[in-house]
């Protein structure tokens, strides 16, 4: 499920972050950067040869002493092995083959994940010969690049996307809805999942997830089959070492990538945090269905207006996703727990909803009659027709006289009309505008 993940792995100072930043600098059609992580940009959405994928920078903190190098590289390589579809193994062509390179290569050889060996810092043609010693790693033919000068990146990416063709899913889980539970530690993610499993009593099996800190539980209900993904909680950087936090973030983001529906769990006694906003912002940006659950509602002193007030404050903090659904529960007492999977299924149904073209155009025609498009410059937007081209999320293409004439306020108006008529609560929708010459 989700886009392929490509992890950049290597010992310190081989140029992992330089390569990542070069790729994230829109030199290869980067779709978008992730929100939130300020100093260390961990994820970037990319596209090459019509393949969309997610790049991960697994670069860590520079070790303080030699004895830390091997353990740090082992941790990086292990994480990459667990969650990546393809691994870029980056080595330093100037410094040459190092013992730490051999340590990483040994781990990668044992895995069945495809690895592209990339020799960096080959800035001149005469340096090409420096790549030959890396054949000793037993990883295959190396690709030579200079990340600082953006040389050889196309050849490297060609090799990467070749592996996507061999990594197609067998489709056996296509009918199962993947739900990722995300949020801070101790917010009640595991308690809620255990409650759901205990009440449904239809667990197929428990298997290790794609990351060390997540467990996938399969649940079959009378309204759908679900995979429940329990993720590691995200802590404040002041409470843990930064390098450990980095891996926690990577694992959580990987779980979001796999999910159809992301459930952000918030502690009712603490409210929403900046970290919550960042992580759900990533789910929003890569177009996942979203449900916000406020847990521990039993611990809040309340009257008949408390829930509305709490929800209003949440919507202000999450104003970038006004479509999100909200649910107030207590995993401990079981209050409204029965509604969790039902509400997640509603989000998923809207996430995969298709609207017939005829009905769609009737609604848009009516919307235009009620509110004519504004004049932009000297031209007024003309909408000839609209059609839905995809789901996850629902995506609509408007064929118009000139896409430059669409004003953001009118685009928002059209989106609101679609939402009012077709109920897309719980999911974002995408509107695209293409030129069609008037006959």
From Swiss-Prot:
PANTHER family the UniProt entry points to: GTPASE DER (PTHR43834:SF6)
Family membership: Belongs to the TRAFAC class TrmE-Era-EngA-EngB-Septin-like GTPase superfamily. EngA (Der) GTPase family.
Protein name: GTPase Der
Domain (EngA-type G): residue spans on this chain: 4-168, 177-352
Superkingdom to which the source organism belongs: Bacteria
Disulfide pairings: none
Gene: der
Binding site for GTP 1: 10-17, 57-61, 120-123
Residue span(s) of domain KH-like: 353-437
InterPro entries linked: AAA+_ATPase (IPR003593), G_ENGA (IPR031166), GTP-bd (IPR006073), GTPase_Der (IPR016484), KH_dom-like (IPR032859), KH_dom-like_a/b (IPR015946), P-loop_NTPase (IPR027417), Small_GTP-bd (IPR005225)
Subunit structure: Associates with the 50S ribosomal subunit.
GO molecular function terms noted in the UniProt entry: ATP hydrolysis activity; GTP binding; ribosome binding
